[in-house]
């Protein structure tokens, strides 16, 4: 098991933003977390990435307890935030060199990985331009490549397909599947059913800091009118019908 989350709770002041979450994610699995804005997806992913702390429960990533070992967690995790945070006065090539150095990669490995990933994402023409001059979608590619440089055991993506053109999104989906086939674990958030259905092995649905339903993607996609239900999930305050419609196929669903 790559990720174990046990009774996880997180507070901002007196507000509980994650409430008693339980989750198990296997190695080599692509796991999608769906839910509306404010459901707690980003907070959960930052905790998994070793960036944010939590108040109750436990989070174990690749047999490492996250709360007391954030540096060790960050060494084995690649994390891509929803909004790229990059050094915009550098070129992508300079930035990847910097990332390689802080990841303790030797120069040859950094250059080889950079070259392969730049080619895969069709970024050759942008590699020597200042990051600050690039479009949002191209910056997102830079952020993704940086997260992949050290070949992480766990890749955590927060709405990371936002801004990618269809061709790049397909390349990225194929790359995620290749990583999973090689044993890496991929966790990403989205509110778009189509992305989750095309990519994920399992899906969790979050609302108000809680997991409302969870199961195999094949079971979720098989549900009648699933797309309409997900639209209601992301736009309506009342999602009881979503949970009720899915509960039958999700209950006792094994990995």
Predicted regions mapped to residue ranges:
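Conserved ABC ATPase "signature" region
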Residues: 97, 101, 108-126
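Conserved ABC transporter NBD signature motif
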Residues: 57-65, 72-73
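ABC ATPase "signature
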Residues: 214-215
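Catalytic Walker B motif of ABC-type/P-loop ATPase nucleotide-binding domains
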Residues: 155-159
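Helix-to-loop junction immediately C-terminal to a conserved catalytic motif
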Residues: 49
